[in-house]
């Protein structure tokens, strides 16, 4: 059995609904389907979820949102009518608007209605059952998912027939609707796959899998055919926008493969994500992907005898902890130590942190460098290929890119280096050309 999730681009209009129908009918194993709210139909269009949040904000400030609400309502009615589906949506929309006008609908509840109406409409279109996410996704009071209750409830609701589930939300212990953060329909699908011990979790979107580099930087980057969960974690952490970060844990825990596919090109196999692979689809490729993010700061301290000073690293890290600052990387040498953090995250407390470091560690020098970009080359096979690091540094040197920081984990799953913001795109392009083309 397969659990299948379709994103907003796959729910954008009646034509996309028909594509989803064809994909589901092509494989009877695809019987548990999670859907997002309708996404953009074209560049200047609006995502339904954005309109729902906007509508709620208007209401809270006493501004009439009737025009926005009508945009949402007419979008779903248009899809319904174009598909020829007999489903009374008017009554539900009227009740929702009435509750909204009386300020009886919370922001989370209103934001969740895009997924709700998508699932209702698709279920009626294909003759599947509709299973409300509020009937099985359970949150704890701290906002985390109660996996035990969630899994048990879905098992009870599963009758072995086709069903559509709205993504993105669940219910709190007090009965109120709560949403995940944006993109959370990915998590709903992962929870469903884990609860029902699916053979695979298919995530359908508008791209054919995970790309080896950002297409806004590299022209027509290749698709990654296979990637491990560890590699995906590294790619996502280092900047690749792949899946919602909470998606991986439920399926990985149950050792369920995750397949990212393209609704607009359903024959493309996309990217398969697993714990490990016995064989390799491309044994000559040693880098899985190249990604990165801009706007970091490097705080560096130097002190003679630092390596022999017990508790030095702990004291530095505790300073950042006191200021609730998440640290991204900690490259170090014998007598020097650097802390790499997001410039935005540290902006309000930089000088206080610098003063605390100066007071508690009394370094010989203490400097901060901003306008830094972090680039990561990720690949599970790099550890078995001598010379990868040398090739990376030589490639960047030939392109005139100065390396400001280097960091590599003991498992050699990635090589991370800092460059100036201005060299960010150049670094990714030349590395892609060197290792992939």
Identify what each model region corresponds to:
Residues 200-202, 257-260, 265, 276:
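Internal nucleotide-binding/catalytic subdomain
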Residues 128, 198, 256, 325, ...:
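Short glycine/serine/threonine/alanine-rich loop segments
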Residues 136-138, 208-210, 266, 335, ...:
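Positions that flank functional sites
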Residues 1-243, 248, 342, 418-420:
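Nucleotide/pyrophosphate-binding catalytic subdomain
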């Amino acid at each position: 059995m397969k659990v299948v999730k379709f994103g907003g681009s796959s729910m954008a209009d009646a034509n996309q609904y028909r594509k989803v129908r064809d994909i589901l009918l092509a494989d009877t194993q695809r019987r548990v389907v999670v859907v997002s709210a309708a996404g953009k139909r074209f560049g200047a269009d609006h995502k339904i979820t954005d309109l729902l949040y906007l509508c709620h904000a208007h209401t809270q400030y006493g501004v009439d949102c009737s025009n926005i609400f009508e945009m949402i309502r007419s979008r779903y009615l248009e899809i319904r009518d174009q598909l020829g589906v007999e489903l009374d949506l008017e009554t539900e929309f009227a009740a929702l608007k009435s509750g909204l006008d009386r300020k009886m609908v919370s922001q989370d509840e209103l934001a969740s209605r895009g997924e709700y109406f998508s699932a209702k409409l698709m279920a009626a279109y294909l003759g599947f059952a509709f299973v409300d996410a509020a009937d099985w996704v359970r949150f704890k009071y701290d906002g985390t998912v109660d996996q035990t209750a969630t899994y048990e409830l879905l098992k009870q609701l599963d009758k072995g027939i086709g069903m559509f589930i709205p993504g993105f939300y669940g219910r709190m212990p007090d009965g109120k609707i709560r949403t995940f953060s944006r993109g959370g329909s990915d998590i709903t699908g992962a929870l469903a796959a884990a609860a029902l011990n699916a053979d695979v979790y298919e995530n359908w979107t508008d791209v054919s899998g995970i790309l080896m580099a950002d297409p806004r930087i590299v022209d027509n980057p290749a698709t990654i055919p296979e990637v491990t969960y560890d590699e995906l974690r590294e790619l996502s952490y280092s900047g690749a926008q792949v899946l919602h970060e909470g998606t991986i844990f439920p399926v990985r825990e149950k050792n369920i493969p995750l397949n990212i596919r393209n609704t607009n090109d359903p024959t493309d196999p996309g990217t398969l994500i697993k714990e490990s692979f016995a064989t390799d689809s491309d044994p000559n490729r040693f880098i899985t992907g190249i990604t990165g993010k801009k706007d970091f700061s490097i705080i560096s301290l130097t002190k003679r005898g630092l390596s022999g000073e017990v508790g030095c690293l702990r004291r530095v890290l505790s300073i950042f902890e006191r200021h609730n600052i998440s640290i991204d990387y900690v490259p170090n040498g014998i007598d020097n130590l650097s802390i790499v953090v997001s410039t935005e995250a540290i902006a309000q407390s930089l000088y206080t942190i610098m003063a605390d470091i100066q007071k508690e560690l009394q370094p010989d020098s203490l400097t901060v460098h901003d306008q830094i970009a972090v680039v990561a080359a990720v690949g599970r096979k790099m550890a078995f290929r001598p010379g990868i690091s040398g090739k990376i540094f030589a490639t960047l040197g030939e392109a005139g890119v100065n390396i400001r920081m280097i960091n590599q984990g003991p498992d050699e799953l990635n090589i991370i280096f800092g460059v100036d913001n201005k060299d960010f795109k150049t670094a990714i392009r030349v590395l892609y050309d060197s290792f992939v083309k």
